[in-house]
Amino acid sequence: MMNVRNLILLSCVSSYAFAAVADGKPYSVPVDADYPKSVYWGDTHLHTRNSADAYSLGNMNLSPADAFRFAQGQELIAHNGMRVQLRRPLDFLVVSDHAEYLGGYYRFNVGDSLVTETSAGKQWQGYLEEGDPVKLIAAFTASMSDPENNYPFPEKVRRLIWEDVAITADEHNKPGRFTAFTGYEWTSMIEGNNLHRVVVYKDGADKTTQLPPFSGQDSLDPRELWKALARYEEATGGEVMAIAHNGNISNGMMFPSVSVDGKKINRAYAELRARWEPIYEVSQVKGDGEAHPTLSPDDEFADFETWDADNIGRTAVKEDWMLKHEY
């Protein structure tokens, strides 16, 4: 069923012919047109209770299955008790929960031994016994900023949780009507600087479950993420890509002149990035990443939803030199 998926998020706006053409001759689209001619609406970046941040901020109930149902137009009860429903259903959805401690906080709080018996689960229990739940979100932050100082889940736990994620997407995929993509977010945050990528699979659970997600606990270097995506395609014959976002809170690290280890960016690096990151998320609640008034002073729309005070961790203020490496 899943092999009919297309990466419809890459579709572009159709070309339309108007009746009144300059030479008065009839017009029709060539049958061999090699570009997309349909527009699809969806969301490539959405978190559920499986994400540590969403769970900590109040979404303790809504699951990936709920998200897929909501995207298709079904009414849900939100975490605040309100009834919610889209006026128009979406064509596709990527549930892209954070790979770091994926599903962990929810499973921990409902007493799932799959998580409570892990090193991370025991650490979290200690925080609660101390009466300091704030340390729970701090543990999540550490997982995406310091791989040497966190407690990743064992491989078996990661695989079991990931299988549930992938199977849920399959169950809600309806070829020709609604596309449910399997995905996750790789959440690298070096010194408070945002390097996040959403990873999107074209495949179904028969392939996506063969390898667990590559997280910030594995590496904070984007090149290691790209290698992981290459390993996935080589091992499964499937297709996968990444979508970077929010360069505006990366403090110059999203489109750098040097890699995270200080080496100068070269053509090979650029081509590798283009191979695995063919598109970019330009706007979301944490600011717009398409243009900045300093870089485009003559563009009256360049100041749309500008968020440029600091980085995502709020550990350092923005400096002017950073801007050209963020948009």
Give residue spans per PLM region.
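Gram-negative bacterial Sec-dependent N-terminal signal peptides
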Residues: M1-A19
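Extended, charged catalytic domains and RNA/DNA-binding interfaces, predominantly
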Residues: A20-Y327
